[in-house]
Amino acid sequence: MNVVVGFAELLTESKELAPEAKVEYGKMIQENAENLLKYVNSILELSRLESGKTKYKHEGCEVMSLCRKGVEFARQVGNGRLAIRLDTNIQSQMICTDENWFSTLLSSLLVPAENDKNSYNIVVRIRYDKEKGIVTFKIIGTPLAKSRFENKTTLIRHEINAHFIHAFGGIYKVQSDTHEGPLVIFTWPKTGD
């Protein structure tokens, strides 16, 4: 917030700044204001979750269809910077989840932040453990695990994701340093056949 206010004051009060500098400062103000807004919104979302004010829908959903849609969405918004491969032997699997929240979860794991200009090779590995009755998702190369400790907004997003998954009886684990690369693993209890 101090950066945004400081640059804004500099722009409005300084008559000595060149027009190019004012444009550059304007871009910095815009970027920092957007980051601040995302941070505040993430905090508010986490606060609603922790206070119990957010209620999830518990509905039967075909998870493979949700994953295919999530991968396709990420490819579209990734502007050619994302190579995503779905690695699974599951054709169809029902789980109990909130479809909108599950889509948001996938988006957070597959789509890099707007200011992240890196390219990513992501593998979405999905397996069903019949003995345990759980579906395991392993998102290898996820931008969210790469930037795990880079900013507070990312930490809050991990907390939001974990809260959602725990509400449905699953686990959520972030590993930023593995031989496969940064990854997130989460599990989901299976429902139906």
Q: Where are the model-predicted features located?
A:
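Short flexible loop/turn segments at helix-to-beta-strand junctions
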Residues: 51-61, 66, 96
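Short alpha-helical segment of the dimerization/phosphotransfer core of two-component systems
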Residues: 31-36
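Glycine-rich ATP-binding loops of the HATPase_c
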Residues: 169-175
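Short conserved segments within the C-terminal catalytic ATPase subdomain
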Residues: 77-86, 118
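Conserved catalytic submotifs in the C-terminal HATPase_c
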Residues: 57-62, 83-93, 129
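Conserved glycine-/histidine-rich ATP-lid loop and adjacent helix of the Bergerat-fold HATPase_c
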Residues: 160-169
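Conserved E/DxxT/N motif and adjacent residues on the DHp alpha2 helix
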Residues: 37-55
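Short acidic helix/loop segment immediately C-terminal to the autophosphorylated histidine
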Residues: 12-19
